């Protein structure tokens, strides 16, 4: 069984959903980035979603673009990121680790080589933010041959055909998009996605984790009551980093507290 399957089964037995924070690796620098990961896990993160710094993150709003720039300015390269990922995996052997990257980064490493590096570093899944499912064949095959789960986005306007394709193509989890657009906390996740989650379950798709606009515990509860297995929060996490760059101890404490609050919202009363 994969780390995702083990994680989700254990949570289901405890009647809990999953809370997954996102950060850009190397933000604001490599050393502090590792402490940030520890703080997120200490707070109760069930899995991690990690970005590799990239100069043109198309799907990201200004908060996560800022994280990319800080990491790039700290000379964080993809090679260093794989070293950091190996360290994270060594310290935290059971937590699922997913990467959110862009196609240029994968191509520049060579597609097969990129997934091989992921496998060597202990990565569990890869989501390529700018490659829709229908263009993903090459990436999916390379992922599966390296024992990496290919993650795909389910948009809020997905039709039946796409939902069935997602169910048969995806592994690990399904990234359920709260809304169209770019990431950020100013555009809240308001739309009910029950019709999508019920169909994804009917088609036996991997568990849905809802992302985009998730910044408050009540949105995590809402995502789960709408049928998602859990929620992913990125911009709200990165905002805490950005707001506390000059007081890292406060930053780490606030990150742990934020995850604790969001995780608490996944627990059935």
UniProtKB/Swiss-Prot annotation:
Pathway named in the protein's UniProt entry: Amino-acid biosynthesis; L-tryptophan biosynthesis; L-tryptophan from chorismate: step 5/5
Keyword Lyase: yes
CDD domains with a match to the protein in the record: Tryptophan_synthase_alpha (cd04724)
InterPro entries membership: Aldolase_TIM, RibuloseP-bd_barrel, Trp_synthase_alpha_AS, Trp_synthase_suA
GO MF: tryptophan synthase activity
Entry EC number(s): 4.2.1.20
Catalytic residues (UniProt): 49, 60
Reactions it catalyzes: (1S,2R)-1-C-(indol-3-yl)glycerol 3-phosphate + L-serine = D-glyceraldehyde 3-phosphate + L-tryptophan + H2O
Keywords associated with the record: Amino-acid biosynthesis, Aromatic amino acid biosynthesis, Lyase, Tryptophan biosynthesis
GO cellular component labels: cytosol
Keyword Amino-acid biosynthesis: yes
Protein purpose: The alpha subunit is responsible for the aldol cleavage of indoleglycerol phosphate to indole and glyceraldehyde 3-phosphate.
Description of how the protein assembles with itself and partners: Tetramer of two alpha and two beta chains.
Matching NCBIfam families: trpA (TIGR00262)
Family designation: Belongs to the TrpA family.
Protein name: Tryptophan synthase alpha chain
Species in which this protein is naturally found: Proteus mirabilis (strain HI4320)
